[in-house]
């Protein structure tokens, strides 16, 4: 399949968390490539700034993705722009709280955004993709679940759940809907409010994210990329022996 599938370019790209940081950079990058972009975010003023930077192809929809009724309404309004063909699940919270300072309510509030918002946006996108059998979902992910840091219990748990969702969707959908492609992407440590001061500029990472989002290939469903390169899944002993006997080498894909 082509790296830049024209079917994606005639449809709408929807980016959650488009009011700042990586989400804003992704929206600007996609709009710069000629796609109409719907940007969701909690703050209308922040989305207005994204619109100023992205130009006329960006459409702002203030929305808290933890409010599923509001999210449904935002998707319905975005339908008027163009048929949705690309969803980038980017919105996230990182509250930096010790677990002993968490309450069930505060912990679940993070889960509601980082996992619940991703789940709900994905389900709403699939409502639009399944009738045509075509679509693209890119989930902005991390390895926080594998190596949790102190004061990050809610964040790590929620991001791990979102990565599990990608694999579960592959199991449920890949055989029936091979042209609905779902991939996890790790953008790296960024110089954003959720990142680190000396991190990568989000504008640089957004170029990789946009390139991967516009790469439509059924083989990418369930794959994980870090920055511009695929991370191959662990390989069992039997598979390793088979590859050795057949003189096969696994090669990660790159952008």
PLM features: what roles do these ranges have?
Residues 62-73, 104:
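The beta1-alpha1 cofactor-binding region of Rossmann-like NAD(H)/NADP(H)-dependent oxidoreductases
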Residues 19-20:
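Conserved glycine-rich cofactor-binding loop
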Residues 98-100, 106-108:
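Substrate-binding pocket helix/loop in short-chain dehydrogenase/reductase
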Residues 122, 158:
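Active-site helix of classical SDR
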Residues 180, 184-185, 191-243, 252-253:
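C-terminal helical subdomain
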Residues 33-49:
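Conserved glycine-rich Rossmann-like NAD(P)H-binding loop of the short-chain dehydrogenase/reductase
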Residues 142:
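Residue(s) in the substrate-gating loop at a strand-loop-helix junction
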């Amino acid at each position: 399949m082509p790296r830049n599938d024209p079917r994606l370019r005639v449809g709408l790209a929807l980016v959650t968390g488009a009011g700042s940081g990586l989400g804003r950079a992704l929206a600007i990058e996609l709009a710069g490539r000629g796609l109409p972009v719907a940007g969701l975010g909690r703050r209308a003023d922040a989305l207005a700034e994204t619109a100023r930077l992205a130009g006329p192809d960006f459409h702002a929809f203030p929305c808290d993705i933890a409010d599923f009724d509001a999210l449904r309404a935002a998707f319905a309004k975005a339908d008027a722009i163009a048929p949705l063909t690309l969803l980038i699940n980017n919105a996230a919270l990182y509250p930096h709280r010790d677990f002993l300072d968490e309450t069930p309510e505060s912990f679940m509030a993070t889960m509601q955004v980082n996992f619940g918002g991703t789940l709900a946006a994905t389900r709403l996108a699939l409502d639009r993709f399944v009738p045509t059998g075509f679509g693209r979902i890119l989930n902005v992910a991390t390895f926080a679940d594998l190596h949790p840091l102190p004061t990050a219990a809610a964040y790590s748990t929620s991001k791990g759940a979102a990565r599990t969702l990608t694999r579960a969707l592959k199991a449920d959908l890949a055989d029936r809907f091979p042209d609905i492609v779902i991939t996890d992407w790790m953008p790296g440590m960024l110089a954003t409010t959720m990142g680190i001061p000396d991190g990568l500029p989000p504008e640089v990472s957004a170029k990789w994210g946009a390139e991967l989002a516009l790469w439509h290939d059924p083989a990418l469903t369930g794959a994980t990329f870090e920055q511009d390169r695929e991370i191959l899944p662990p390989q069992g002993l039997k598979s390793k022996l088979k590859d050795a006997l057949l003189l096969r080498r696994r090669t990660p894909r790159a952008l």
